[in-house]
Amino acid sequence: MSRRRRIYEGKAKVLYEGPEPGTLIQHFKDDATAFNAKKHQVIEGKGVLNNRISEYLFQHLNDIGVPTHFIRRLNMREQLIREVEIVPLEVVVRNVAAGSLSQRLGIEEGTQLPRSIIEFYYKNDQLNDPMVSEEHITAFGWATPQEIDDIMALAIRVNDFLTGLFLGIGIRLVDFKMECGRLFENEMMRIIVADEISPDSCRLWDIKSNEKLDKDRFRRDLGGLLEAYTEVAKRLGILMENERPAGSGPVLVKS
């Protein structure tokens, strides 16, 4: 088997050259990181769950007309994606006060926000991904005003879809992070959703118990991250009740 050419390696994923021009292979690692990799642990099976959950969500977004980079799943850890030029921004959509928003503004965690709030963060680990305004984004050329409008429109559509989807399986979408990229097709360019959407990039709380089913279990040393991700996958119908993700550790089995 020929050795694949690695294009990029991040904290939780590796990108390899794809089989056709304009494609990449996105590989999900088992690494769990927080606070820009200051905290790090390998949790066996996490990459499999994130791959399958992100695949499920991106395929549904494609189906309702929200453009994403996702083409198809290749195996348990990898998916074929369209190659895009990543906009160097993290787009955070908040529905409920939590995390840094609660700390910055002194709002009690769990407080429902008056409306969904969209925030932008400059993707730069050395600077700890600082929060930026639209003025910063356009002044430094990270995105044009039209691209910002397109990104915000996508963020609202993704939020509406995810909120309803998770509500239907007893999960509250507190907030989520997404990234966008520029897809070049012939002479045209359009903004599409890229990266991943998974419990790594969302805050997901059980509606009844407020139990955290996301990466806060790792950030806050709550334990049970793999079990929480498995529970999300089961509720989405991705895993059967007693199915075990390939290469994973213990899996939650409901009594």
UniProtKB/Swiss-Prot annotation:
Its EC number is 6.3.2.6. It comes from the Bacteria. It catalyses: 5-amino-1-(5-phospho-D-ribosyl)imidazole-4-carboxylate + L-aspartate + ATP = (2S)-2-[5-amino-1-(5-phospho-beta-D-ribosyl)imidazole-4-carboxamido]succinate + ADP + phosphate + 2 H(+). Pfam families: SAICAR_synt (PF01259). CDD domains: SAICAR_synt_PurC (cd01415). It is an enzyme of class 6 (ligase). PROSITE patterns: SAICAR_SYNTHETASE_1 (PS01057). GO terms for biological process: 'de novo' IMP biosynthetic process; cobalamin biosynthetic process. Keywords: ATP-binding, Ligase, Nucleotide-binding, Purine biosynthesis. Pathway: Purine metabolism; IMP biosynthesis via de novo pathway; 5-amino-1-(5-phospho-D-ribosyl)imidazole-4-carboxamide from 5-amino-1-(5-phospho-D-ribosyl)imidazole-4-carboxylate: step 1/2. InterPro entries: SAICAR_synt/ADE2_N, SAICAR_synt_PurC, SAICAR_synth, SAICAR_synthetase, SAICAR_synthetase_CS. One of its GO terms (molecular function) is phosphoribosylaminoimidazolesuccinocarboxamide synthase activity. Belongs to the SAICAR synthetase family. This is Phosphoribosylaminoimidazole-succinocarboxamide synthase A. The gene is purC1.
